[in-house]
Design a protein with these regions (language model features):
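Intrinsically disordered, low-complexity segments enriched in Gly and acidic/Ser/Thr residues
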Residues: 172-204
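A common structural junction motif
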Residues: 69-71, 104-112, 226-235
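Accessory, usually C-terminal, subdomains that scaffold auxiliary metal cofactors
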Residues: 191-193, 198-206, 211-260
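A generic structural motif
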Residues: 72-79, 114-121, 233-247
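Short, well-ordered beta-strand segments in beta-rich or mixed alpha/beta enzyme
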Residues: 48-52, 76-104, 151-157, 196, ...
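Metal- and O2-centered redox machinery and metal/ROS homeostasis
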Residues: 70-73, 185
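Short S/T/G/P-rich N-terminal loop/turn motif that feeds into the first structured element of a domain
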Residues: 2-68, 90-99, 110-183, 214, ...
Length: 260
């Protein structure tokens, strides 16, 4: 009896994908474009965590934050007279555990509101020239700005269908979204603090969005305006819960000081 010839798949082991050819490993630095389109990179980023609470002593906590020169902002919750939020920002996420959390634990009756916990990291899109400004300085300056005390914070999760769209379609949707935000910013109505939340939250959010402004109404109008975009109307699986508050304590931002 003749043997059946082995097929190529039977005789040759399947080849493993080649590893990324980036310095012999994976390059996790943020990428941008400098002068004349020259690639630039920076392996630094800001972690930003929002936390919601109830029944704490806001005035006492603000004093503790002041004495500790805390890299954090305290917001009074507009929906809850006893509620407040804390936004911490740092390059080393250990700062939240080692410095911010011990200050919070001094509040004996503090009630933690898990639904408002959001953690993310700043990121570059790829065309930015000044990566330190985009990733570190600008996000910190925005949340510390006393001229924009009103804030709306919420998580966003896209549907998997977005990732199946062509790169060109994704680019168009992001450009539409970004154009609206830019217009509101140029008019002085709102600034945005958007961080990536992949793998950093229990609900697997893609992004954490912070809208900041002098007044609250433009922030609501911006959310409403965004609802009409293709990305939001077709490819957002979940938005919220929304925290709405006004800053009652902010640190003074120093552009020359390096954040922890």
């Amino acid at each position: 009896m003749s043997e059946t010839p082995a097929t190529e798949s039977q005789s040759t082991p399947a080849k493993r994908p080649a590893p990324p050819e980036v310095d012999g490993g994976i390059d996790l630095s943020e990428k941008g474009r400098g002068e004349a389109g020259k690639p630039v990179s920076l392996n630094r980023r800001l972690f930003m965590q929002f936390m919601g609470f109830r029944n704490g002593n806001i005035e006492e906590l603000a004093g503790l934050f002041e004495n500790a020169s805390a890299q954090a902002v305290i917001y009074q919750d507009i929906h809850d007279a006893s509620g407040f939020g804390v936004l911490a920002f740092c390059e080393d996420p250990g700062y939240i555990v080692d410095e911010i959390q011990p200050l919070l634990r001094t509040q004996k009756d503090l009630e933690y509101r898990e639904e408002y916990t959001m953690l993310g990291r700043t990121y570059a899109i790829g065309y930015e020239s000044d990566l330190e400004d985009v990733l570190i300085k600008r996000p910190a300056q925005r949340v510390c700005d006393p001229e924009t005390p009103w804030a709306v914070y919420y998580p966003v999760r896209r549907s998997g269908a977005f990732e199946r769209q062509s790169r060109e379609d994704q680019r168009k949707m992001l450009a539409e979204h970004g154009g609206i935000g830019h217009a509101y910013g140029k008019a002085g109505y709102a600034t945005e603090s958007r961080v990536a939340g992949h793998g950093l939250n229990k609900d697997d959010n893609d992004f954490i969005v912070g809208l900041l402004g002098k007044q609250l109404f433009p922030l609501s109008a911006l959310v409403q305006h965004m609802r009409r975009t293709r990305q939001t109307s077709e490819f957002i699986q979940k938005m919220g819960p929304f925290f709405i508050g006004r800053a009652v304590w902010q640190p003074e931002y120093d552009a020359n000081a390096r954040l922890v």
